[in-house]
C-alpha cells in the first residue's frame, strides 16, 4: 500500500502525518508533540496501552524515514486515540473534544462532514 504524507496543524502543533494501510501513523517523537507532553510520559502510556487494550503487532510498524539508517517505530490511529484518552494536557483535552465530536456525529447522523473541504 502506498505511503502518503499529510500535514496536521492546529493552533499549537504542526505534524507531518504518515497515511498507510487506511490509517494514520505517528512516531513516538510525534505523539508527544501532538499532546504537548514529555516523551517519557507518552512512552509509559504506550506501554500501558499495549499491556491493557491493544495488540502491539498489529498497531506498531517499523518504517524507514528520510536521512536515517535506523527503522523507526510508528504507531497507528488506535494507539494515538488510546494515548489521547489517557494523557493530561491542554492538547489532550482538545484532542478528546475533537474525537468525542466525531464519534457523536457518527452516532447521531451516521456520518461526519469535513467542513474544511466544503
What are these regions (language model features)?
Residues 1-25, 34, 39, 64-118:
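Positively charged, aromatic-accented nucleic-acid-binding surfaces
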Residues 28:
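Helix-turn-helix DNA-binding elements, focusing on the entry/boundary residues of the two helices
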Residues 53-68:
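Short Lys/Arg-enriched helix C-cap and helix-to-coil transition segments
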Amino acid at each position: 500500500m502506498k505511503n502518503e504524507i499529510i500535514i496536521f496543524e492546529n493552533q499549537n502543533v504542526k505534524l507531518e502525518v504518515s497515511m498507510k494501510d487506511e490509517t494514520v501513523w505517528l512516531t513516538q517523537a510525534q505523539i508527544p508533540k501532538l499532546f504537548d507532553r514529555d516523551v517519557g510520559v507518552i512512552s509509559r502510556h504506550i506501554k500501558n496501552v499495549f499491556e491493557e487494550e491493544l495488540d502491539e503487532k498489529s498497531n506498531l510498524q517499523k518504517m524507514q524515514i528520510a536521512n536515517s539508517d535506523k527503522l523507526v517505530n510508528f504507531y497507528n490511529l488506535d494507539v494515538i486515540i488510546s494515548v489521547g484518552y489517557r494523557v493530561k494536557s491542554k492538547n489532550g483535552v482538545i484532542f478528546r473534544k475533537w474525537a468525542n465530536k466525531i464519534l457523536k456525529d457518527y452516532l447521531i447522523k451516521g456520518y461526519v462532514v469535513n467542513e474544511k473541504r466544503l
